[in-house]
Amino acid sequence: MKTIYKSKYYKIVCVLRWLWLKIRFGSKFHCPKPSMIGKRCGIYIFKNGKIKAKARIIVNDDVMLYAKGTLQIGAQFGINQYSRIVAHEQITIGDNVTIGQFVSILDHDHQYEMNDEQLQLNGYITAPVAIGNNVWIADKCTILKGVTIGDNVVLGANTLVHKDVPSNVVIGGSPFKILKQLT
């Protein structure tokens, strides 16, 4: 028995969603090959925003992609349910990157002040995020602004990435620690 995700009808509907995004956003959504866009995805591209994919991408159900800046995605990219990528400035994702469920990748923090015992939000502080090639980001990871993740990296579940990660490592924890060197 086939699951609905493997049925040809589901694939056709996903490709129609991709086509609708190409029509809706025009040159702001560059994805050269038909891609799988799941149900209830929030894909928002604002005035100066762009989403540029190198090749076909797989975006599972209930994912949010938010581009006020540039979101660049490499080949062989997949993102799973309930994850979000929010680019106010720039997020670059390399080739062969897989993102688990409930992952957040953010290139900004909120800027705020305390005035007369009242919290006042004053925009955002941004810094680019770069994720290398051959990276697996497990469930519930959070990647914060200004981070560079090297090539051939595995992020364990629930990892908080707040500083740069070297290549060829397995990391985990909150904040993260290097758990293993990959050869």
Predicted features by range, described:
Residues 1-106, 132-133, 141, 167, ...:
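Domain-scale signature associated with acetyltransferase and cell-envelope carbohydrate enzymes
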Residues 47-49, 69, 127, 145, ...:
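Short, conserved secondary-structure segments in the cores of folded domains
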Residues 86-87, 139-154, 159-163:
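Beta-rich strand-turn-strand
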Residues 109, 116-117, 181-182:
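Conserved catalytic-core motifs of eukaryotic protein kinase domains, centered on the activation segment
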Residues 118-129:
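A short acidic, glycine-rich active-site loop
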